[in-house]
């Protein structure tokens, strides 16, 4: 039976982004790191460099504790290739409204490198 509704195709990069945001909102750092980051993955920001599952889990726990909540106001830019994701979003936390920038280098659907910034 024909319908006027179009199926929305979710790309691997969009799925990764959606899961990343969901786990951050749910404070699910274990699942976030275990499912989205390689064992030796590295996160690079201007404030620090963090490498490995244990350090990443500690980093995200502390990060979420400081922010308390994350509300995505808009996904301003998003681009992906078969092994990269790069996005800009406007978010609100208890610290205020900011623009965040995140780039991921992926291997087998998991991050090997995560570059992040806030403005």
Regions found by a protein language model. Name each.
Residues 2-39:
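Short acidic-aromatic low-complexity motifs
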